[in-house]
Amino acid sequence: MQDRSDQFVLALDQGTTSTRAILFGRKGDIHGVAQQEITQHYPQPGWVEHDAEEIWQAQLAVARAALRDNGILAKQIVAVGMTNQRETTVLWDRSSGEPLHRAIVWQDRRTAGLCDELTTAGHAGLFRERTGLVLDAYFSGTKLKWLLDHIPGARSRAERGELAFGTIDSWLTWKLSGGRAHVTDPSNASRTLLFDIHRCCWDEELLALLDIPMALLPRIVDSSGEIATIAAEWLGAEIPLSGIAGDQQAATFGQVCLQHGMAKNTYGTGCFLLMNTGQAPMASCHRLLTTIGWQRQGKTTYLLEGSVFMGGATVQWLRDGLGLISSADQIESLAASVADNGGVYLVPAHTGLGAPYWDPFARGALFGMTRGTTRAHIARAALEAIAFQSADVLQAMEKDAGQSLSELRVDGGAARNDLLMQFQADLLGVPVVRPQVTETTALGAAYLAGLAVGFWQDEAELTALWRADRRFEPSMAEDRRSALFADWHRAVERSLHWANAT
């Protein structure tokens, strides 16, 4: 076997709050990390935007830093894999490469009213059947329609082929390739409300409903294969970009959930629980999403997904919004300083509720406070809310799949919180397993890229590389679990339908 000890795969991980570049070796081990935060823009309540040009410059900077700071030359990089925040929508000029507007982030709720109008008009079923998604402001399609409706002349320019639309993967691939590649993979395309997941192509009927010209859309390519070539001016040599997947699909691949019925939960800004359902899409009867995991070697793998909007973002809100903590790391010790939540429940519906409720008009609320409530109780309620939301999703997932989960693999920043992971295992009643390499999103992108160029031979090799760091066994009595769920669901019920559609 060829000695590849001095060769690496570079993973570009463009997330909601930060952009990173991570170097992976043959054993799936990390050889270098560079990171830069991304500015969040909140122009109106419920609106969330990013500067697409800032994202590009940050991604380029961290890619260069990962190589430079670790003494790695461009010729040692056999492939680049990319993973990205999904649904976030960019519209740019094909000639200048300049964005026409700040990117509309997946958390943005400005099109909730439009989604209501489309639902009232009877279109929700068609979107659901074709795309596997619920008709919600979360996804890219209505965001793109908003941009075309509100930027003067944009729709006519789009019809003339002067503009390009893309999720963040498309935008960065365009920039990295010097404008030569306008592409996306099925995992990202399946999050737009514009993509037929059964035929794996853009859907003309859905495009017509949203008045979106086909000329805007990127070409569909495999998640693992010959995608684009990164121009030599960026990293010092031409390098193949051979792997792309949306962040949650990439994390599922990085967790090596490659067999039917395996599932993972990523605790990032939001929480995202995905289950592998094999080579055929599984329609959900419990308000989950059917989505494409990845496409390689002519085969498409499908997933069931439940999306929680406020995961780690709940902790950020405690820090930045309320000032209860000065750093996110403080929450575990603060929450552990009390024996339980003291009857306090936080429903973090700050941007509505995702699966399985899908209520864009729910709003955040605290219940059960007394004169004895302390900041520690609120901190604990915030952590527990992350686990409660994830448990709601898993219960719906088990009903859809007709089988119980044997274990849940976990990753993301909050997965390092032992108190949260133990509470999650207690609520679910199944073991929660944290891997040694928790950077599974970037690892999944690296695996997809490396498989395409032979750096790793096959999926069996990836399975052999996966190692557990810690296994959290459930220890909560069933009557206690049931009582906690009953109170949680009472709290959720009171937070629903709070805001007005206008």
Curated annotation (Swiss-Prot):
Ligand binding (glycerol): R86, E87, Y138, D247, Q248
Regulation affecting activity: Inhibited by fructose 1,6-bisphosphate (FBP).
Catalytic reactions on record: glycerol + ATP = sn-glycerol 3-phosphate + ADP + H(+)
InterPro entries, per database record: ATPase_NBD, Carb_kinase_FGGY, Carb_kinase_FGGY_CS, FGGY_C, FGGY_N, Glycerol_kin
GO biological process, one term: glycerol-3-phosphate metabolic process
Pathway: Polyol metabolism; glycerol degradation via glycerol kinase pathway; sn-glycerol 3-phosphate from glycerol: step 1/1
Known EC number: 2.7.1.30
One GO CC term on file: cytosol
Binding-site positions, ATP: T16, T17, S18, T269, G312, Q316, G413
Binding site for ADP: T16, R20, T269, G312, G413, N417
One MF term in the entry's GO annotations: glycerol kinase activity
Enzyme class: transferase
Residues holding sn-glycerol 3-phosphate: T16, R86, E87, Y138, D247
Swiss-Prot/TrEMBL keywords: ATP-binding, Glycerol metabolism, Kinase, Nucleotide-binding, Transferase
One Pfam family named in its UniProt record: FGGY_C
Matching Gene3D superfamilies: 3.30.420.40
Function: Key enzyme in the regulation of glycerol uptake and metabolism. Catalyzes the phosphorylation of glycerol to yield sn-glycerol 3-phosphate.
Family stated for the protein in its record: Belongs to the FGGY kinase family.
PANTHER family with a match to the protein in the record: GLYCEROL KINASE (PTHR10196:SF69), SUGAR KINASE (PTHR10196)
Protein name: Glycerol kinase
Organism: Dechloromonas aromatica (strain RCB)
Taxonomic placement: Bacteria, Pseudomonadati, Pseudomonadota, Betaproteobacteria, Rhodocyclales
The gene coding this protein: glpK
